[in-house]
Amino acid sequence: MSSFVLRPARVEDIPVLGSIERAADERFRATGHTSFLDGETIPLDVAQRAVEAGRITVAEVDGEVVGWLLVTRLGAELCLGQVSVLPSHGRLGIGTALLRDSITRARAAGERTLVLNTQSDVAWNMPWYARHGFVVVPPEEWSPEMRAVTEAQREHGIDWNLRIHMRLTLA
């Protein structure tokens, strides 16, 4: 396999983002977290706006997009919205490169924090983010926006008994 390159997503990349997300989410089948397997992916209009705003970075191998990362805002904080890598290209450092790139760009932009929500019991979720400096945000420290995300995800069927918010302090 050739090496990968990271670049800002382009409009022509949008159609493959959902299929990459669905393929990556298949890993959850073995964990019992089947709510991620409902087939729902980033809506096309959301992807369009994110691409136009420069908020999606893709990883490309031999001209094929094999992974992507989305950053959004959660109130005053930058939020890691999605990281997806095709399983056929997993464990090659692509996800780590996407994450490190987002951290570097956030710092360069003067962001103070980067937050996310993830599963606490899945090896490629909470422990992976912790290795990159993210720490669990205790519920009593959740922002109103974190509480709103939690409630919206619960309403969508996501079990928050094993889900957490995490934060990386950048500045």
Which residues does each PLM region occupy?
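Conserved N-terminal entry element of GNAT/NAT acetyltransferase domains
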Residues: 1-15, 164, 169-171
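Conserved GNAT-fold acetyl-CoA-binding loop/helix
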Residues: 22-48
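A short helix-loop-beta-strand connector motif used in the catalytic cores of GNAT acetyltransferases and
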Residues: 42-58, 79, 159-161
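Conserved beta-strand in the GNAT
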Residues: 58, 64-72, 77-84
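Conserved acetyl-CoA-binding loop-helix of GNAT-fold acetyltransferases
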Residues: 85, 91-104, 131
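Conserved beta-strand-loop-alpha-helix junction that forms the acyl-donor binding cleft
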Residues: 116-125, 142-147
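Conserved acetyl-CoA-binding loop of GNAT-fold acetyltransferases
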Residues: 130-138
